[in-house]
Amino acid sequence: MDVTLRPWVTDDAAALRLAAATSPDLSSQLGDTDLGTIDACEGFIDRQLRRRPPLGQDLAIAVDGRVAGNVGLSNVDRQHDTAWVYYWVAMEFRGRGLATCALATMSVWAFDYWELFRLELGHRLNNPASCAVARGAGFGAEGVERAKLRYGDQRFDVETHARLATDPAPSVRLLPTVAVA
């Protein structure tokens, strides 16, 4: 299995459409955007996933050339050298450790290239798989924010995690990263 991180391209629209159609839990992570057509997916890629420094960066997780997910960095705060990180993996690619490796790789890149000191993320308490990704990538739990997220009429508690540049590196494989600006 050849896994790389690379920038999103408009040609990834079909893979994004398939991921959204077969992974209904992604709708909240993708902002409840309608991704039912190739045109809609192309627009989403251009507006949301082709972000470039200094605003942030999204990278496609590619498996044997196919888009399997995303790992991203946003809300960069240069005064405090912090940022928010996030990830998702399409249903058919879950359970292979892809998100953990991608998050660990993005973290190293954020510390080295962006010269950030603290990375933060959060996951719903009812998402133990996301918690396992965070912990596996070296992010320690810091606390629970009650009723932080709202999807539809339902509110969710969120566990926050952080990783510092001075924290020990996790024992996971880092992924090759292709042509990141």
Q: Which positions does each model-derived feature cover?
A:
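A short helix-loop-beta-strand connector motif used in the catalytic cores of GNAT acetyltransferases and
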Residues: R47-A60
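Conserved GNAT-fold acetyl-CoA-binding loop/helix
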Residues: D25-D46
